[in-house]
Amino acid sequence: MNPSSALMPKATAIPGCILRTSRQCSKHNQTSGIRASSSTRQYHVAAIESPARRRRDSTFMKRSDFIQARNFHATKVLAAIPDPYKVLGVDKGASAGDIKKAYYGMAKKYHPDTNKDPGAKEKFAEAQSAYELLSDKKKRETYDRFGSAAFDQNGGFDPSAGAGGNPFAGGGGFHGFGGGFGGGFPGGFAADINIEDLFGAFAGGARRSGRGRRGPFQEILVGEDIEVQTNISFMEAAKGTSQDIVITPLKECGTCKGDGLKEGAKRTQCRQCNGTGTRVHLMQGGFQVAATCDACGGAGLIVPRGSHCGTCKGDGVVRERKTVRVDIPGGVEDGMRLRISGEGDAPPTGTAAAPGTRTQRGDLYVSIRVSPDERFSRSGSDILYTASIPLTTALLGGEVLVPTLDGQVKVKVATGTGTGDRITLSGMGMKKLGGRSRGFSPNGDLKVEFKVAMPKYLTSNQRTILEVLADEMGDKTARRIMDIPRDGLSTAPAADASSGNESKSEGFLKSAWHKLMNHKKPAGSENSSDSSSNKDSNSSGDSKKSE
């Protein structure tokens, strides 16, 4: 054990975070012999730095002889779309045919199914994107004018905005925040605000230019809609028709031209709100609430007393009687509404804030009521018709006349048709709204449902025939009340079963039929029998005389 180690403090008594050791080795020249080198271990205690000082020191984490520098850089710039002309290898003045030819060549060369090169798929995708851009006339014109920035989805640039327009409308704009401010905040803060409309209002309207200062918002007065109802027949709904509808909409006053003022009169500033359009109310607790001025309606201007137009009473609009011809297309259903744009009421411009306020008439809505038809019923574009057929036609088959939208047609009835059986006549139904679909008929179908008419009362002849039919069909459950001789149907001797039964049954059916139809024997047969009897009597008398 080294004697000096007893004088050393224990390492555990000093915190490890501030304990540093150093080892010094010394060599002595060998004079009289070899002397072992002695090693000395020294402990150095570093002063503890305060946390505040370490925070102020920018290098307290790691002390070194060099200064550590940290560089700040902007976010990586998004790569712009490649030049489509260079991708396809054509000039900017190339025709559509040259562009198409170049694209087909690249597509054939770099198609992933034929070219297994790892980079072929990427080149094929670039060629597709380039051709899609250059094949569209508008997209190509936009690219030639603005470059790749016009198609940057993250740039928010709209090349069609123009001067005074909304450059943030393209590429999504502010719509990424949940459809305006309302989508980004719980509770629906201003959920109905459209940021593009808001920007357009502050910009003074998109695509509008002009000198002079404009207001921050452009007011548009929209008139009320008019709703009317008209009745049409089932056939008119199927074929389409036109109707004249009388309405009484509001129109611009011809006397004041919509100003609501007399000739030479002007609006004056509202004294209640001093032209601001709002009035501030002081509430309890020092709160202030701003509300729309009830005197001017928020316009800030009022019409002086006695300056109103005598025709429209200051509203700027008057009612007129008008006839509108409405074209009702074929295929409309009961309860549908047709909208005729711009045929509603004109807005009351006499109450507008400024004489030059933009206006827009309302719309006319026509509700269609279709009267029911006695013969047909409807299911969408299909027509349903119930055809009543006799019992004999249902059993034996035949043809019946079925009415359609274009007249009557003959329909074959299969043998054994029962109640509820249907047949479909394709393309003979209602017209389908929305245009003709490819591969499908523009009209619906006519579905005919058969109903067998069962007789409630039978004559004696009809019942006799049916009872005979029941006997022929072996129906033992049918009720029989007619007195029909059935001796021919009785069992015959076994020896005569083959031929005798047939002749007897045939004779029975004939006799039953003659009895049913009240057939009498022919007159010739009776005369012949009488003459034969007379001859027999005469011959017998002659024989007696001879005796």
Swiss-Prot record:
Keyword Manganese appears in the UniProt entry: no
Alphabetical list of Pfam families matching this protein: DnaJ (PF00226), DnaJ_C (PF01556), DnaJ_CXXCXGXG (PF00684)
The keyword Zinc-finger appears for this protein: yes
Compartment(s) where it occurs, according to its Swiss-Prot or TrEMBL record: Mitochondrion
Comp. bias regions, Low complexity: 524-541
Region ranges (Disordered): 484-547
Superkingdom as given in the UniProt entry: Eukaryota
One GO cellular component term noted in the UniProt record for this chain: cytoplasm
Positions of the J domain: 83-147
Coiled coil: none
Biological processes, Gene Ontology terms: chaperone cofactor-dependent protein refolding; protein refolding; response to heat
SUPFAM superfamilies in UniProt: Chaperone J-domain, DnaJ/Hsp40 cysteine-rich domain, HSP40/DnaJ peptide-binding domain
Biased composition regions of type Basic residues, renumbered to the chain: 512-522
Start and stop residues of the CXXCXGXG motif repeats: 253-260, 270-277, 293-300, 309-316
Molecular-function GO term, any one: zinc ion binding
Targeting signal (transit peptide) range: 1-79
Disulfide bonds, paired cysteine numbers: none
Keyword vocabulary terms for this entry: Chaperone, Metal-binding, Mitochondrion, Repeat, Transit peptide, Zinc, Zinc-finger
Ranges annotated as CR-type zinc finger: 240-321
Principal subcellular localization: mitochondrion
Entries under HAMAP family matching the protein: DnaJ
PANTHER family with a match to the protein in the record: DNAJ HOMOLOG 1, MITOCHONDRIAL-RELATED
Protein name from the UniProt record: DnaJ homolog 1, mitochondrial
Organism encoding this protein: Emericella nidulans (strain FGSC A4 / ATCC 38163 / CBS 112.46 / NRRL 194 / M139) (Aspergillus nidulans)
